[in-house]
Amino acid sequence: MACIDNAMRALFLLALFCVVHGEKAKSKDNDAKASGPGGSFDITKLGASGNGKTDSTKAVQEAWASACGGTGKQTILIPKGDFLVGPLNFTGPCKGDVTIQVNGNLLATTDLSQYKDHGNWIEILRVDNLVITGKGKLDGQGPAVWSKNSCVKKYDCKILPNSLVMDFVNNGEVSGITLLNSKFFHMNMYKCKDMLIKDVNVTAPGDSPNTDGIHMGDSSGVTITNTVIGVGDDCISIGPGTSKVNITGVTCGPGHGISIGSLGRYKDEKDVTDINVKDCTLKKTANGVRIKAYEDAASVLTASKIHYENIKMEDSGYPIIIDMKYCPNKLCTANGASKVTVKDVTFKNITGTSSTPEAVNLLCTAKIPCTGVTMDDVNIKYSGTNNKTMAVCKNAKGSAKGCLKELACF
């Protein structure tokens, strides 16, 4: 019996040894499998290479699958290095809260055949409580493909991949990172709610096509703060159906300014309301703070309760502009009147210099005038010497006080 007991004990110890070491090996070989609440997934331990040449798409996708499938707080680590990846799809809902820690750089493939029609580079869908943070970069490598952009020439065009797209994301945060040289828009939010964008840098050449910095549509509760944006299109663009937006401490330039719109291009667009832009600086931008609606608008909608305050212009073109006959590159299909209503807009303490004589442009339509426009302490001077500072105001109704006399439209 003793022999049997000793043999059983030996077998038990051997089995235990195998189980323990087997689990260690399994854990070492596959760090992507979460074993309980909380977890961290380093993409280099899943096969990613930081040499900037090896395709690391599979490793990043595996890290997402494991982090999204784990409970508690999960972290995907992008360590220092340059990681080449193709299109990434991060789909929820997730069982826990996921943080993507970007310490290194993700480089987008320049092979457009890898992107499906109207595809994006990094697309995040139906994920709540997402955090993307770090000091690394999301590099769209746009210079390699910008020449293939046809949207600057024709109305109906094939869109190049956006860099970071978040759809149906609630209570999300993007902080600290740099978005660089997107092929199209750098960041695009659609039907998102309660989003915080802070301490972000967005960078592309001033002549890069359609490289909007941050765009949002059909979203609410978006805050953008302490962010520097220099791009080839709008620094920030607020699309239809958006409300409760707060933009503070943003430096914009180069770029086309901070815009609401374009509005009315597509059918069934929804209203824009409760937009606040405060304590921002615009440097050598093509436009300043702008509201724009297509002159051949397909939708009837209203933009209202819009407040601009403490905005400094540094040699920006058209610092204040409401354009209800917007028609980029003269590609509109008809010379019609916009169906968009603009009302209850305040410009308060807007100062600095303009690169164009027209420091204020309120270009509304006779059929639907702009109403409730308040200009309070607007003091912008033309920086040139060949003309004088002026305002161009058509079909706009409101009040002005404390403004440079040349800019008081009312």
From Swiss-Prot:
| PbH1 repeat placement | 192-218, 219-240, 242-262, 272-293, 337-377
UniProt GO cellular component terms: extracellular region
Q: What is this protein called?
A: Exopolygalacturonase
**Main enzyme class:** hydrolase
- PROSITE patterns in the record: POLYGALACTURONASE
Q: Where does it mainly reside?
A: secreted
This protein's UniProt keywords: Cell wall, Cell wall biogenesis/degradation, Disulfide bond, Glycoprotein, Glycosidase, Hydrolase, Repeat, Secreted, Signal
Q: Gene3D superfamilies from the xrefs?
A: Single-stranded right-handed beta-helix, Pectin lyase-like
Q: Where in the cell is it found?
A: Secreted; Secreted, Cell wall
